C-alpha cells in the first residue's frame, strides 16, 4: 500500500508544471523542468529562478516559509519569475544540470536566468539571512534587483 501511494504521488509530481511544485523532488528531471520554465518565462516576460536545495535542508524550508508567510513577496516572485526547485540530495545531486552553473557552496542557492537561459546571478542565500531565517527586506530587494524591467 505504501509503495502504491508513493508511486501515485510521484506520477502526480512529475506532471505538475515546475513553478507549481512546492518541494524538492529527487525523481524530477531537472533539465526538463528548466527547459519548461524557460519556455514559460519567454512566453510571459519573466525570468527564471533555480532554487537549489533539498527537503533535508532546514534553510531551504526556512526560505519556503518566508514566501508562505509573506504573500506580497510570493506574489512579486510569481509575477516576475518562474521558479524551479532543483533537488540536491544523496538520491539525486543533479550533477549534470548543475555543472552548467557556478559551484554551489551551500543550500539553498539561487540562480537567476534570463528567459533565454543566460545566467544573470548566482546568489548565496546566506547573504539574505537574518537571525534564524531569511530577511524579508533582503529577499524582496534581491527579487526587485533581478526582476525583468517591464
Question: Language model features by range: what are they?
Answer:
Residues 54-68:
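Conserved redox-active cysteine motifs that mediate thiol-disulfide chemistry
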Residues 105-150:
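Non-catalytic, surface beta->alpha helical segment in thiol-disulfide oxidoreductase systems
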Residues 10-28:
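N-proximal helix/coil linker or "cap" segments that precede and/or mark the start of modular domains
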Residues 44-55:
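Short active-site neighborhood of thiol/selenol oxidoreductases, capturing the structured segment around
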Residues 92-105:
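Structural alpha/beta surface segment adjacent to cysteine/selenocysteine redox centers
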Residues 28, 68-93:
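Thiol-based oxidoreductase modules, predominantly thioredoxin-like and allied folds used
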Residues 26-46:
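A short beta-strand-turn-helix
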Residues 1-12:
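Sec-dependent N-terminal signal peptides of Gram-negative exported proteins
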